[in-house]
Amino acid sequence: MILLHVRKEGENMKKIILASGSPRRKELLELAGVPFEIVVSEVEETIGAYSSPSDIVMSLALQKASAVAENNSDHIVLGADTIVTYESRILGKPSNEAEAKEMLQLLSGKTHEVYTGVAIIAKDKTVTFYERTEVTFWELTEEEIDAYIASKEPLDKAGSYGIQGKGSIFVQHIQGDYYSVVGLPISRLVRELKQFNIDVTHA
């Protein structure tokens, strides 16, 4: 069993709060043995004039975490955001099936990038970081795309696919962190949490 270690003696154990309702991020934290609670951020995400996808995901992750941290200042709050990009075009969650089909046709046979940004907020410290992963799709037939859209899986996913689900059959090659594409670069996160005197790597 993996336990939470807080190294400052005499300090009350701080809760880790995930500022996201994503079932995939929840599953990854559970997989790593990170104890946490969920408080879904209700913040309206706004994308300003940022210079890069990495800036966008880190800013959105920080917006989510900050909104929850306002009422949980004694604890550690995690926020995360994921976007898919292809040739400088940002592919978020599709608004409908037609948009999902357009995105999948665009990604067919091509290499795109997935950025996930993470923000960790505590009373005396804030850390933000991101991971970039390249994903290459096989050439997709219209029948494959239509069948996938009919499953409804792509409708709540950035880029209109879930690499951990049925969308996995579209992936020819991946370079980078698979878990970041799922929604949370869990290995990097565990290491960054050590800056907050939290270590989940010891049994």
Curated annotation (Swiss-Prot):
It catalyses: dTTP + H2O = dTMP + diphosphate + H(+); UTP + H2O = UMP + diphosphate + H(+). One of its GO terms (molecular function) is dTTP diphosphatase activity. Keywords: Cytoplasm, Hydrolase, Nucleotide metabolism. It comes from the Bacteria. The active site is at D81. Signal peptide: none annotated. Its cofactor is a divalent metal cation. InterPro entries: ITPase-like_fam, Maf-like. GO terms for cellular component: cytoplasm. It is an enzyme of class 3 (hydrolase). Its EC number is 3.6.1.9. The record marks R24, T82, Q164 as: Important for substrate specificity. Pfam families: Maf. GO terms for biological process: nucleotide metabolic process. It is found in: Cytoplasm. Belongs to the Maf family. YhdE subfamily. Nucleoside triphosphate pyrophosphatase that hydrolyzes dTTP and UTP. May have a dual role in cell division arrest and in preventing the incorporation of modified nucleotides into cellular nucleic acids. This is dTTP/UTP pyrophosphatase.
